A protein has these predicted regions:
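Electrostatic cytochrome c docking/interface patches
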Residues: 27-66, 156-158
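Solvent-exposed, polar/charged alpha-helical surfaces in well-ordered, non-transmembrane soluble domains
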Residues: 61-69, 95, 109, 113, ...
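Periplasmic/extracellular electron-transfer cofactor-ligation site
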Residues: 64, 68-91, 117-125, 146-152
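Electron-transfer interface patches adjacent to heme c in soluble/periplasmic c-type cytochromes
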Residues: 92-110, 125-137
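Axial heme c-ligation environment in periplasmic c-type cytochrome domains
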Residues: 114-146
Length: 158
């Protein structure tokens, strides 16, 4: 009996260390959609009333940093939706910020909300996983006030 105890303990230890199978894709997608819905409920437009910048350049500088760290990998340098994760097939292609029909072109609060809540497709719900309202404001300003106009001008689109 005493000899069996170490063997049973070893088996129990090995079983505890075994990796669990990842959840089915449907569960992951449902979980992501639930988090997007939760983020939509938590989004607070009045939080932006307290965000101030010393200069517009300060907001653009911060927004550029946030974009490079959080957005560039999917949206790409110019916002065309051709970032490294898309090129590698690890993310769905997001819409282009440069498209004439871009739905947030004249909707800064809508853009902030989209960044905060993410999307059921692939976009992270940044408001729940790391970006504060100040960073959301900065990156939205960077996209709408710098990135989109700059690259549309380079493309010859007014």
């Amino acid at each position: 009996m005493r000899r069996a105890i170490p063997a049973v303990m070893a088996l129990a230890w090995l079983a505890a260390c075994a990796k669990e199978a990842p959840p089915p894709a449907e569960e992951v997608n449902t979980g992501h959609a639930d988090s997007v819905a939760m983020a939509a409920e938590m989004f607070d437009t009045t939080a932006f009333d307290t965000v101030t910048w010393r200069t517009p350049d300060e907001a653009l500088s911060r927004g550029g940093l946030v974009f490079r760290v959080s957005c560039n990998k999917c949206h790409g340098v110019m916002g065309n939706g051709d970032g490294d994760l898309v090129a590698d097939g690890k993310s769905a292609k997001p819409g282009s910020f440069l498209a004439d029909s871009w739905k947030y072109a004249d909707d800064p609060m809508g853009l902030r909300k989209a960044i905060f809540t993410g999307s059921a497709q692939d976009m992270p719900y940044w408001g729940l996983v790391g970006l504060k309202y100040r960073d959301l404001d900065a990156v939205a300003s960077y996209i709408s006030d710098y990135l989109r106009p700059t690259f549309m001008e380079q493309a010859g689109t007014p």
